[in-house]
Every structure is written in C-alpha cells, then in structure tokens.
Amino acid sequence: MTTPLIEIRQIYKSYGNTPILNNVSLNVNHGEFLTLLGPSGCGKTTLLRLISGFEQPTLGEIFINGQCVNQLPPQKRDVHTVFQSYALFPHLSVFENVAFALRCKKTPNQEIRKRVFDALKLVQLESLAERNVKQLSGGQQQRVAIARAIINRPQVLLLDEPLSSLDYRLRKAMQSELKQLQKTLNMTFIFVTHDQEEALSMSDRIVVFNHGHIEQIGTPKAVYETPANLHVAMFIGEANIFDIQVHTVKDQDIVTNIEGIQLSCKNTGNYQVNEWLHLIVRPEDIRVWSLSEVEKTEGMLPGRIVDIIYKGSTVDLKVELSSGKIINASEFFDEDDDKLEYTLHETVWVQWLPGWEVLLPHEG
C-alpha cells in the first residue's frame, strides 16, 4: 500500500475558546489534486495554514513524507502557498518576482535564468518576463504567483482560493490551466475553495468541510451523486428535497407518498417501514411534461410552471406543486425540440425515474 504524502492525524485547532477544527484526520496522496470545499468559516483555510506551517495545531500531528512536521518552520516543509492576494512584489518585474527565492539562495545567475524561464513557460508568460507586475491582468498576476511557487518544485502546492477575484470567463480558463499544470508537474495540489463548480471540475478528490469537521471525502462523482448527508447534498449543487415516510418495503424498493401520489424508490439504505427519510432529486434528473405529451400519469406529480429561466444550453424551470412547494428542473435546450417550449403558468406533470433519487436518514 502506497504511503500518503501528507497525513493529518486527529487535528484540533482553537483560537482562545473558539474551536476551528475538531478532530480532523485526512490523508493526501502523491500527485493528487485535492480540494478542501466548504462555506466561509468552516476551517478549510486554517487547515491549509497548518499544513504550510503558518499556524500550529492545538492538538494532533501533521506528517509529510512520514516525518512529523509540527515543529518545522514553513521554509523547511517543502510546501509552497499561493495566496488569494498573490503577494507579488509590485516594484519588481515578472522575472524578478519569480527569481526572488533563487536569489535569496544565491543561486548562480545562469541557473536562475534557466529555471525562471522554465517556470514562466509552464504558465505561458515567458514573453512577459521583463514587464512590471503592476501592468498585468489579474489572471497574469496569478500565473506569476504560481510560477514563483513552483520554481523550486515543492512536493506540495497549497492554493488558498486563488481564483476568487477573477471574472467568470477568466476563472473558467484558469481552472483548466491549473489542472493541466498539476498533471504536467505531477505535483500534489491542495486547493481551497467555497465554489462547488471549481471543486467538481478540477479535483481528483473533494473534502467537504462544515463547522470545523469533515462531512465527506470522495471523488467529485461520489460526492455529487451519493452525498453522505443533507448538508453535502445541499452544498454541492442544487437539490430538491422531500421529507418522506416509508409506507411499505417491497423487494429492493420502498413505497412512499409524495404530494398525495404513491411513488416507488430504490431502497439504497436498507430502510424500514415507518422510517422518515430525506428524498433528494437533482434538477437535471427531473423531467417536465406538458399535458398533451403524456397519457399515463402514474408516478408523476402535477404542477404549474411559475418561472422559466433560459440559460443558453439549458432551460431552468420552477414548478409549483399542489402543496405550494416549489421544485427546480433543468433541461438541456434544443432549439429544434418543441418539447422545450414551455409557457408561464402552464400546468405540467413532473417525474423522475426510480433510482435517480438519493435517500438519506432524516435529520430532525
């Protein structure tokens, strides 16, 4: 079995009487793109600072390559951090910003030049080497910060919400570039974000945080499609949530009642009769039918369209059910498909196939 590059063992961190991290344990593998995901104040950036050495744990141990680093200062941990602010030297050129650490080590000039241009080439900035960083765009400044961080080829690159200040198009482009850079370097990246889309599109694994503890660790697919609890389901993407009670258990299915309609669901958790559950359906798994499109309505819920949002590639619908509950549906747009011509206040039927839902134990 491969030894993890980083081992986080039962970490606690408090500031005075305020707990920030509570019994956090985590392994990080060699060459992995791992994302720490969670809302503001959940402890993800604190964990990053503990790994880098800028903070010390109240209790617990951190190992890098099998060595406990609790007492090691940041410069001896072979990890580098890209901060949200980039922390560039505004009076220096791109070249000198990237070369700074090498000059501090009194590296020969010829070697500095080669290594700096190698790093700039990786982030596609070699043509701007002599430009002052104040003259660069936000995306270019971020690339400089990354080049400076990888100049010494650390084992781990820590990225603290580095894309948060970029506009949407640039952020999307940088997501792809960061992932490609990580693959090229075969370096371990630990990426902090509160943006679910970033986490899903970039990560090998996602660690979902909430109130200082880990809710779930898994691949993007696992975290999205099989959330461990209600918080994960609601935080990762959109979710329609129904509170249901198991009426009968039949083979591998359960039978329940939603909005007065009897529905069957896959019994994925060995749930029992009378047990209360959360039933979760993603908007993209809901199908919306006009009255003229269906003859048999068994297993369908009646509703009324109360909002239509055209997004180019998708049409998002808000449907009010008979109880007044609003659910969200998302359909891929096809301009040649008449089925996607919905009308505000139109009466419709909604459904999903058994197995497309997620069932979770009820949380009170």
From Swiss-Prot:
Its placement in the membrane is given as: Peripheral membrane protein
Span of domain ABC transporter: 6-236
EC main class here is translocase
Q: Which UniProt keywords apply?
A: ATP-binding, Cell inner membrane, Cell membrane, Membrane, Nucleotide-binding, Translocase, Transport
**Per the record, what are the reactions this protein catalyses?**
ATP + H2O + polyamine-[polyamine-binding protein]Side 1 = ADP + phosphate + polyamineSide 2 + [polyamine-binding protein]Side 1
Q: What is its EC number?
A: 7.6.2.11
The identity of this protein, by name, is Spermidine/putrescine import ATP-binding protein PotA
